[in-house]
Every structure is written in structure tokens, then in C-alpha cells.
Amino acid sequence: MENRTNFFHLHLISDSTGETLISAGRAASAQFRSAQPIEHVYPLIRNRKQLLPVLQAIDDAPGIVLYTIVDRELASLIDERCIEMGVASVNVLEPVMNAFQIYLGAPSRRRVGAQHVMNAGYFARIEALNFTMDHDDGQMPDDYNDADVVIIGISRTSKTPTSIYLANRGIKTANIPIVYGVPLPESLFVASKPLIVCLIATTDRISQVRENRVLGVTQGFDREHYTDRAAISEELKYARSLCARHNWPLIDVTRRSIEETAAAIVALRPKLR
């Protein structure tokens, strides 16, 4: 019998950089070896306008929702919508803050990002996060030369979570999907500053992740083609040929965590350290 890995969607919503939340989510998920999370990270969510698309993304791919949102109105909206969708939501900091308030006999300030010292490193991370979110999934292709790293790869190779992990370390990162037969943007080929790296994985790994990705998604997918191993093999072959043609390095993420993938990228460009 084929040894398959179970996957689940893990949505991480933060009004700051998301580092605290990512660490908590990974610490918890590491205790469950039978399933691996597909991380969806949403940093810098500070108003209703920013939150509504996140809630739609959760509705499209239901799973566990963890959040660190100081604003009570936004936190309540997350909980209400998650109840409507029938998914679990956890305000990760609230029990800790309540314990502090009871022990200290004083209310919290409820200030966004209060744990961060406003130094140059913090502002560099925020700038990198803003850049990375603006350049996710092929968006805003005209200024790739402002990036430190551009990650390319076919669907479900962890481009977005790796990009956000790098951004949390002050590395401006864009990511672009490789779609079989669709040319990459011309601006990528003339960009001289960024390190361009391609993420790949085994056909079986990608197929498994994609099969779990389409669970609960009612529209927008040709499911059979999206998860077909032969089609995925062709996509990977196409990605490899692009990288060989342009001398772009490949990183196989099949057995790598996001942290390990990010470290491998940084190792390719020592000045990013």
C-alpha cells in the first residue's frame, strides 16, 4: 500500500511580522507526525479591508486558524466568520495576556507590534514584508530588480511561505509561478540584482499537496489535470529546462522544512546573511 502523507491547511493571521505565530504553529504541528500543515501566512493585517480577503481565502481552503490580532473588533470578526465556516480559530496571545492582566492587576496596552523594538532591523523587516506581499504570486513584475531574491517554481512548491520567512529576516523576496507553456515576465530576465532560484519537489509530493489543496475548493480548478502525476512531471521538466537555459539554481524542497529551504537560498548568496 502506498505510504501517503496527510496534509491540512493552517492559516496564520498576524497584525505584525507573524514570527511569533509561525513559531507557535510549527511547534504545535510538529507534535502530529501523521499530518503536515500547508501554511498560509498573512502578516500585517491591521484593518477590516485587509482582513476580508484573508477570510475568503480561509473559506476557499478550510483549516485551522491561528491569529495574533490585538484589535478586538478584528479578532471578533475572525472568530465569528470561523464559526460560520465551521473551522477552529485560536487567538494565540489572548490566554497569555489574560494571565498577565490577572497577575499584574493591570490591563494590557493592546498596541500592535509592541514586542518589537523600533530599530533599523525592525523597519527593514517591515519593508521586506510589504515588498514580499506586494510581489507574491507574480504580482507587480516591473520592479523585480528591487528584490534581493526572486523565487520561481510550479504550483505547491512552498514559494509563498519561503518568501515570507525570508522577508521576516529583512530579505525582499518576490515569487513567480511557473506555468507550463506560459512565458515568465520579461522583467525577470533583465533583472541584474536579485538571486533567482527555482523550487522543485518530487512528482508524488506535489501531487499529494495539490490533492489536499483542492479539498473543499468547489470551483477554479481542473482537479484531474492539477493533480495528475504525468502532467506534474511535464511541469517539472519544463521548470528544469528553464533553469538549465538560464543557469538558475534548483532547490529540491521535498524533504526540507521552510527554514531549511530559506537557509539553502541564503547559502547561495552569502551577502544575504
Swiss-Prot record:
Which InterPro entries does the protein's record reference?
Kinase-pyrophosphorylase, PPDK_reg
Group of enzyme by EC: transferase
Q: Which residues cross the membrane?
A: none
One family from Pfam that matches here is Kinase-PPPase
Q: Which UniProt keywords apply?
A: Kinase, Nucleotide-binding, Serine/threonine-protein kinase, Transferase
GO MF terms held by the record: ADP binding; ATP binding; phosphotransferase activity, phosphate group as acceptor; protein serine/threonine kinase activity
Q: What is its EC number?
A: 2.7.11.32, 2.7.4.27
The entry's ADP-binding residues are 153-160
| Catalyzed reaction equations | N(tele)-phospho-L-histidyl/L-threonyl-[pyruvate, phosphate dikinase] + ADP = N(tele)-phospho-L-histidyl/O-phospho-L-threonyl-[pyruvate, phosphate dikinase] + AMP + H(+); N(tele)-phospho-L-histidyl/O-phospho-L-threonyl-[pyruvate, phosphate dikinase] + phosphate + H(+) = N(tele)-phospho-L-histidyl/L-threonyl-[pyruvate, phosphate dikinase] + diphosphate
Family according to the record: Belongs to the pyruvate, phosphate/water dikinase regulatory protein family. PDRP subfamily.
Q: What does this protein do?
A: Bifunctional serine/threonine kinase and phosphorylase involved in the regulation of the pyruvate, phosphate dikinase (PPDK) by catalyzing its phosphorylation/dephosphorylation.
Q: What is this protein called?
A: Putative pyruvate, phosphate dikinase regulatory protein
Q: What is the scientific name of the source organism?
A: Rhizobium johnstonii (strain DSM 114642 / LMG 32736 / 3841)
